[in-house]
Each structure stands twice: as C-alpha cells, then as structure tokens.
Amino acid sequence: MGPSGSGKSFFMNHLVRQYYEQGTHVVLVDTGNSYQGLCEMIRCKTNGADGVYFTYTEEKPISFNPFYTDDYVFDVEKKDSIKTLLLTLWKSEDDKVTKTESGELGSAVNAYIERIRADRSIVPSFNTFYEYMRDDYRRELAEREIKVEKSDFNIDNMLTTMRQYYRDGRYDFLLNSTENIDLLGKRFIVFEIDSIKENRELFPVVTIIIMEAFINKMRRLKGVRKQLIVEEAWKALSSANMAEYLRYMYKTVRKYYGEAIVVTQEVDDIISSPVVKESIINNSDCKILLDQRKYMNKFDAIQSLLGLTEKEKSQILSINMANNPSRLYKEVWIGLGGTQSAVYATEVSAEEYLAYTTEETEKVEVYRLAEQLGGDIEAVIRQLAERRRKKE
C-alpha cells in the first residue's frame, strides 16, 4: 500500500521481476500500464515465447467459459466460484443476496452440472446454463410442493438481468468462449483492463474471469510457485457479495503453492471496507507499506486495521525521513506476520529504472526509439542508460 508518487509501481516491478527470475508464474491484473515495460522486456528476451500483454478493448475483449473443464470434474470450490460469478452478474453491489437466492442458484448450478455430465452432447457454456434455468429449472420451481415465493427467489428477474450475457445479448461474448484463456505455458502475463474500470457491470465480471483463469492454472501446475497480483482492480471485488469469493480465492491460492498480492494507493478504500478487512487483510501474512506521510492524520486507523505494533508504526513513519541525498532510492517497509519487520531501500540500475518507469515522457521516449530499432526495447534501454551515465 502506498499513495501516488511513493514508488509503489517501481517497487512492484522490482519485486515481480525477481519472482519471475526465480521461476515463478506471474499473472497481473492492472489498470494503468504499470508493467508494460517489464512485460515487453520479457517478451523480447524470450523471443515472444513469454511476456503476454492482454489489453481489454471492444474489438478484442477478454472472454472465457466458466463451465469448461478438461475432465468434467467440478469440486465444491469450483461450483461455489461459478455461483458467485452468477450472483455478480445478477445483483448490483448494493443488493443483498439472501440465503434462498444463494441456495437456489447453488442448486441450479449443481443440477446443470449433473445434466452436462450425463449428456455430453450439451456444450457446457453460459448459453446452455441460461436455457436450462429458463426452460427446466423455472418449470421445476413452479411444480414444487413447497412453493418458493418470488420475493425469496425471483427467477424471472434473474433471467431478465442475465439476458445481456446470453446469445445475441450485448455481452454474449463474455462467458461463452470456445477457446479458454490458456495461461499454463506462459510465465508472465499482464491483463490491462483500464478501459473498463468505470463500467460497473463489466469490471467485476472481467476481474473474476481473470482470477478464475488463474485458479484453473494453479490447479493444473504442480510444484511451481504461482503469483496473482491485482492492482486497483481489487475494488471491483470489494462489495459484500464478493466476500465469500475472496475468501475462497485466498484459501485456494495457499493450497496450490500460490500467492495473492493486492496493491492499492487509497487508504480510504481499505479503511471503509469491512470486506477488505475480513477477506484480504485477515488472510495476508505479509504487508508492504510505502511512504505514508500523506496519511499521517489517518494512521491510527491504518495501524488498528493492519494490527501494527508501536515498533512497526515507528518504522513505517520513518520511511524516507533520512535518505542519503547522494543516492537515488525510495524506502519501503516489509512486515511478516508480526514476527519480523524492517525498512528497506528500493535502489535500481539506470536500465531497471527505464524498464520500470511509469513517467509518461520517459515511456514515450523508450517506445519511440524502440520503433526505430525494430521493437528492440532492450537495446533502447541500454543506449538511454549509457547516455544518462555519461551526462552524470
């Protein structure tokens, strides 16, 4: 956590690069092109074999199939994640999900899965699930001896709301992909979804789609560290309806030798959200904070929320207070579950600086020169770094 200008993107680039070099599979969900330079470097280094940059656009949206599996095996967690996705499609952030709604949708998912297992001619997809709900589950509800009131579970309202994700609807591409996002063979993947961060319908759905793709990768990739980093996109998951999904994700990540990292700059987002406290902070043993001077007057709330000791508070408030003026670096505090903590300096070479920078003028210069050199970003960075050293 660090406010704008604290060196957060820089530190994260540095951290991620080291994870990657140690063999970790990294998946990033970003909303600001912070990792474009590093991703491009990896793509050049591997001759296009790695370093994949997905940018969400209307022409090339990110899509997947929540009902697809290689082997028709759906464990309890997979079924729960499908149910959570469907509730997200149906309900707005402020709508409270009742036990009946959650229970009925869970039962419908179960029954649909049994059907596609029994009849392999049915193509598992959101389209066929929607048809099952509309044609079969709705009829079965009406025929029950104990009636389910519309006020408890309004299936017509659900079908109407979800219609836009069904065949010929405006978002019919999202959940009916014939090709699934294949993350298995690539070790460094960035999903850039800045273009939809203001879209309250698409943003949470696409974020869940990416996280589901990551979880599918984790289940299949044994004995290798996997890392999911969610930048400001985590806000899409901070509604009360998402709490269960976040808990499920953290539990699953740990089980499969993975790490989930949430990156934020707005302290108010964290302080004001009980979901963040219950689902993210309580499941995070490692906490990393950058310069917090901007939030001095709110630091008691931060300390309470993160469960920091007085010693840890003093360490954090000392960040960048006595930096060596002859060196270029920014400090960062790392705390490990209350057992160990210290302040470190993020100090990088001129080459690393140019690969990590999010400064618009510097990025433009790097990419302009790369175009002239046939896309060789590494050669450009070496040239510019050498030029800077000569100036010094």
Protein language model features and the residues they cover:
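Glycine-rich phosphate-binding loop of nucleotide-binding enzymes
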Residues: 1-56
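Structural recognition of the conserved hydrophobic beta-strand(s) that form the central parallel beta-sheet
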Residues: 26-29, 229, 253, 259-265
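Hydrophobic/aromatic beta-strand patches that form the interior of the parallel beta-sheet core
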Residues: 27-29, 52-54, 189-191, 261, ...
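Conserved nucleotide-binding/hydrolysis micro-motifs of P-loop NTPases
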Residues: 32-35, 59-61, 195-197, 234-235, ...
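P-loop NTPase motor domains
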Residues: 36-49, 56-258, 274, 324-327, ...
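P-loop NTPase motor core of the ASCE superfamily
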Residues: 73-128, 274-392
